[in-house]
């Protein structure tokens, strides 16, 4: 099976150009490297080490990932360099996440890692090695319109990762390429299997990258001091104790340990809010409880991908989590760094600290942090 090249999603590079690929050991970046290699480009692989781990840590996959990346690089016939960004990751991603958790918010480290590490530190390193562009295995597309770069959704709507890339700027997009943005995930796996890649069936990484498969609560306890407190209903009735509000997020059901109360119905309880000042976790009963829904939000730390921001009020689509269907909304500018977002329909479990990302059709416009 030959590779179908989606040339509309690939810049017209000179074939003697050097393109660096962030090779993670996963199937997506492996096929991205293969696509570039078979199009005739000079390809080099870069494997990032963003977290200092004990090699005996049963939850860390970095050792296996590096082994897989080396095997793929050898298979394709490209050099592989290992680069350590653990200090930069700690300072620009992990510490930010700790600060957010400590303030009762729920951060998204993948968003910050893309802006600060993959498309900054790794891109800079690729340039030092003589590469003109950095390629990754992200499911997204870049389009150049008269030297203004647009971030577009992937052809695979189920795997689209534009949500996680909304903080990228014009320089980062101009110097990046997403070789598999035009593919379906099933096509990527089929190519990898046909070419004999050892990772063709490797499962996708999920969850927070630096936690891996370990329990979230156990990991966070290593870095932040938990303060147990009360769990209250929305009416103010104390019905239990929590282990620390940093361990919970809006919409969460599991881990509350307050079910089966004789003074309540059988419907499950859900986190609806976190009162950081009082160290109180507020819950409601029932998945469809009206307090779990909101038709508006405000956001800060606004970033627009194009150099010229859109006109306001802006009618567009938005997501408040990555796998959510696009939601119609109107965005109104409040000041230089704040916007108000009014949705057409109520949205469930809008969460402080997460990103709200805006779209016009297939284009990702940018976004902000929900507060």
Swiss-Prot record:
Location relative to the cell: Cytoplasm
Catalytic activity: S-sulfanyl-L-cysteinyl-[protein] + uridine(34) in tRNA + AH2 + ATP = 2-thiouridine(34) in tRNA + L-cysteinyl-[protein] + A + AMP + diphosphate + H(+)
Single GO BP term: tRNA wobble position uridine thiolation
Family: Belongs to the MnmA/TRMU family.
Region (Interaction with tRNA): 159-161
Record-level Gene Ontology MF annotations: ATP binding; tRNA binding; tRNA-uridine 2-sulfurtransferase activity
Role according to the record: Catalyzes the 2-thiolation of uridine at the wobble position (U34) of tRNA, leading to the formation of s(2)U34.
Protein's recorded name: tRNA-specific 2-thiouridylase MnmA
Record-level GO cellular component terms: cytoplasm
PANTHER family named among the record's database cross-references: MITOCHONDRIAL TRNA-SPECIFIC 2-THIOURIDYLASE 1, TRNA 5-METHYLAMINOMETHYL-2-THIOURIDYLATE -METHYLTRANSFERASE
Keywords: ATP-binding, Cytoplasm, Disulfide bond, Nucleotide-binding, RNA-binding, Transferase, tRNA processing, tRNA-binding
Binding site for ATP: 22-29, 48, 137
ATP-binding among keywords: yes
InterPro entries according to UniProt: MnmA-like (IPR004506), MnmA-like_C (IPR046885), MnmA-like_central (IPR046884), MnmA-like_central_sf (IPR023382), Rossmann-like_a/b/a_fold (IPR014729)
């Amino acid at each position: 099976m030959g590779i179908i090249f989606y040339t509309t999603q690939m810049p017209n590079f000179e074939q003697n150009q050097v393109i660096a690929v962030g090779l993670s050991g996963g199937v997506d970046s492996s096929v991205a490297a293969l696509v570039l290699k078979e199009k005739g480009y000079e390809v080099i692989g870069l494997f990032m080490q963003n977290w200092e781990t004990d090699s005996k840590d049963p939850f860390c996959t970095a050792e296996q990932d590096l082994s897989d990346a080396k095997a793929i690089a050898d298979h394709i016939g490209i050099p592989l360099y290992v680069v350590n960004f653990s200090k930069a990751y700690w300072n620009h991603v992990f510490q930010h996440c700790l600060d957010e958790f400590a303030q009762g918010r729920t951060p998204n480290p993948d968003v910050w890692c893309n802006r600060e590490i993959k498309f900054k530190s790794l891109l800079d390193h690729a340039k030092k090695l003589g590469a003109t562009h950095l390629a990754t295995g992200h499911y997204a597309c870049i389009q150049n319109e008269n030297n203004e770069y647009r971030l577009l959704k992937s052809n695979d709507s189920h795997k689209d990762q534009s949500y996680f890339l909304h903080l990228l700027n014009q320089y980062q997009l101009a110097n990046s390429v997403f070789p598999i943005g035009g593919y379906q995930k099933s096509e990527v796996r089929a190519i990898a299997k046909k070419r004999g890649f050892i990772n063709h069936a490797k499962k996708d990484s999920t969850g927070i990258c630096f936690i891996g498969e370990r329990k979230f609560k156990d990991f966070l306890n290593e870095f932040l001091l938990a303060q147990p407190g009360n769990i209250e209903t929305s009416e103010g009735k104390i019905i239990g104790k929590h282990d620390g509000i940093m361990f919970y997020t809006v919409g969460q059901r599991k881990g509350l340990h307050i079910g089966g109360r004789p003074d309540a119905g059988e419907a499950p309880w859900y986190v609806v809010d976190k009162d950081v000042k009082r160290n109180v976790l507020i819950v409601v009963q029932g998945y469809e409880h009206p307090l779990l829904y909101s038709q508006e939000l405000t956001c800060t730390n606004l970033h627009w991908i194009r150099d010229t921001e859109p006109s306001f009020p802006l009618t567009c689509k938005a997501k408040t989590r990555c796998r959510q269907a696009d939601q119609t909304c109107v965005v109104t500018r409040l000041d230089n760094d704040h916007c108000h977002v009014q949705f057409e329909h109520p949205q469930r479990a809008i969460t402080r600290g997460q990103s709200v990302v805006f779209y016009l059709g297939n284009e990702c416009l940018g976004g902000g942090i929900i507060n």
